Amino acid sequence: KKPAYLDGIENISLDKELSNQVVFDELFSDMEVVDKSWVYSQYDSMVQTNTIKGPGSLDGSSIRIKETGKALSMSADCNTRFCYINPELGAAAAVMESGRNVAMTGAVPKAITDCLNFGNPTNPEVMWQFKECCEGIKKACKDLNTPVIGGNVSLYNETNGVGVFPTPSIAMVGVKDRKSTRLNSSHSRASR
């Protein structure tokens, strides 16, 4: 059953007059936007000295596989707010974002695994979210020719009867020749 909250979202007006300063302050205080380097800088990304592209410069990382001349790239993604507003498109967007991030490392996306986290499945609205997310994942994987090779489902994720936003976390892997080109997400020099 389509959740009732979506009717209210569809009628939201975006015609608010906001100053640039208010928009700037709200945007850059949002945890979805701010720098997350304090998280990924806490662990050793150079274990066994096989890291080609560690965390920080792209949203995907690569490690070499010494015996093969190849490298394995990986990205993990999900935007729960997008999935809350439109579960099918939000889940598809998570797959596509992972695919783009893997491609940015120079690798070809090969497969995904997922971790599907939802509220109480006895609630028809939660099951509708779950079904819609599965449809989005299926369609995006078909478009990218990336099979789902594993995953898990975690249900009953709620506090005081309020379920979590639909959270279809996607991890994608890709393979590349070690000498292949990768794209940088940052500028190599200042613009003029």
Annotate each predicted stretch with a short phrase:
Residues 1-182, 192:
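Glycine/proline-enriched, intrinsically flexible loops and inter-domain linkers
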Residues 186-190:
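Hydrophobic topology marker
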